[in-house]
Design a protein with these regions (language model features):
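Exposed, low-structure sequence patches enriched in small/polar residues
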Residues: 1-185
Length: 185
């Protein structure tokens, strides 16, 4: 049974469609813009009995622009985004078993908070006859905050990013690493 492992669960989904027409008054429309948005397509958030919290959100948006002037054309832009996160709080006051000292527990005077966020987004756009755009972005971020005592606390974070232009074949990647410590006297 899911109720034995999950303390709360939420699900959301929403769709919206709009059509905008423009042109000279009393004449046929020269431009029609149709937007279809799933904001969000899926949004699921769960709190687990273990203290872990997870969430996943996905959104999709499509814009179609039709020009009826002259030969006319139709351009389409589709964008999507996905995000997944996990958060876990570990009660370190009860002790944490370490791999290299399994018989002993390492105790802190507070909890350790761990987090992981993965995000992905993409854009695909086509404007006849030759213009087009196809890009995507990926980021992964992990964080940890801790407090060894009332006088010593800190945080650690690691991040990875990737940006790709699939139309011209260019990829950029980046890494970030951060470590902070706070001493109180």
């Amino acid at each position: 049974r899911i109720s034995k492992t999950v303390s709360s669960l939420r699900f959301d989904s929403n769709f919206r469609r709009t059509v905008e027409e423009s042109g000279a008054k009393g004449k046929a429309s020269e431009r029609v813009v149709t937007k279809s948005d799933w904001q969000p397509l899926v949004n699921v958030a769960a709190s687990w009995k273990s203290g872990m919290r997870t969430s996943y959100t996905s959104s999709v948006s499509t814009t179609e622009t039709e020009s009826r002037v002259g030969a006319g054309y139709t351009s389409t832009t589709t964008s999507s985004s996905h995000s997944f996160s996990v958060q876990q709080t570990i009660d370190a006051t009860k002790g944490i078993s370490l791999p290299f000292a399994s018989s002993r527990k390492f105790k802190l005077k507070s909890s350790v908070n761990l987090g992981l966020v993965v995000q992905y987004s993409s854009v695909n756009s086509t404007i006849p006859p030759q213009l087009s755009e196809k890009k995507d972005d990926l980021s992964v971020t992990s964080t940890a905050t801790y407090s060894f005592s009332t006088n010593l606390s800190g945080s650690f974070n690691f991040g990875f990013t990737q940006n790709r232009d699939l139309q011209i074949g260019v990829t950029r990647r980046g890494l970030t690493l951060g470590l902070t410590a706070s001493f109180r006297f």
